[in-house]
Amino acid sequence: MKYSIFSFFSGAGFLDLGFELNGYDIVFVNEFNKSFLNVYKHSRKVLQLKQPQFGYHEGSIECLLKNEKDFLSKLVAQKKIEQDIVGFIGGPPCPDFSVGGKNRGIEGENGKLSNTYIELICQEKPSFFLFENVKGLWKTKKHRLFYDDMKKKLHKNGYVTTERLINSLEYGVPQHRERIILIGFHEDLLTRLSYKLDEDLPDIPSDMFPWEKYTKYTKEEILSSSFPTTNDFNEESSYPCPNGVLKDLTVEYWFQQNDVSNHPNAEQYFVPRQGLMKFKSIEEGDDSKKSYKRLHRWRYSPTAAYGNNEVHLHPYKARRLSVAEALAIQSLPKTFELPTDISLTDAFRTVGNGVPYLASKGIAATIKHFLEQ
């Protein structure tokens, strides 16, 4: 089978990379932010990945639903004529559904983009789609109504769906990051593949879609691991990983694996104008506050969200995390880099916004297994 992926809200391309390295072909990339799109182009060049067949579209997804509708429709139609399985993947900006964000829901500018993405899927009818967003969209009562309405719209347009609240830790990412993943397959594709589904059930039965096949750890294994809590902050200190810890889920394991000290983005971090003593007063592993969370070297990171004044401190250095360290926490390959001329604000925003690479890779493998089993 040939898989052609149209990527939306692409950012730095973490989600796309997980699909691409699983044998999917990224043919179209849409991103509104010019700086983020430059990161995407730079990383592809460094990783020596071929350019998307239909190139890059810099602009709002809303244009593709309105005045540029024919442009996108022709591209999708071309891949369908070639008998490709066409996939739409994307994670619309999510502050409006986040408890830590603005929580405006569908009324917020970012919230509206989720609805626009669903409308685009219904308009173009790809073979399958992936929708990624924050837990709040699925868990919060007032947002859940909007989420359920989106699903109903998709079901009416011929999609059969499956969903799961994932934690990136399950896929081997050193980061506690919960996200709702909604995946849908058009009934035409499932008929073509001889899937027999109950016409009255718009959801794929839980025992049919292998959500856990490509996870690395169960939630129970993660909870039973003896991760340390806090230690005194000792600058430039070193000590081995304690027994009973899932080492490959720890910050220090990934710092070492990605050789973050020698990474091209190693020297990119915010330097405070004042308050250095505060950087030294917070215990290693104390991530209890809204801001100034100090990571523990032998534990996983809290969610890599570096906006809204959220400051994450290095476990054993008196400074904030570097871009290289943030990339490691997002489980990117050590060869993945950002252009060094990007602003620090944009660098941390695009890294924090991304879907962790290993989670993306696992989900991409799961979809492929479902379609090819």
Where are the predicted features?
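A generic secondary-structure signal marking the coil-to-beta-strand transition
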Residues: D84-V86, E178-I180, Y300-P302, K317
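Redox-cofactor binding/interface segments in oxidoreductases and associated redox assembly factors
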Residues: G90, F131, Y306
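C-terminal target-recognition/interaction regions appended to catalytic cores
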Residues: P240-Q373
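Short, conserved catalytic/metal-binding motifs centered on acidic residues
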Residues: F88, L182, G352
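Short, solvent-exposed loop/turn segments at secondary-structure junctions
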Residues: G13, K34, P93-P95, K135-G136, ...
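Class I S-adenosyl-L-methionine
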Residues: D70-D84, P95, V99-D286
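Core alpha/beta nucleotide-donor-binding catalytic domains of modification enzymes
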Residues: K2-K125, K135-D148
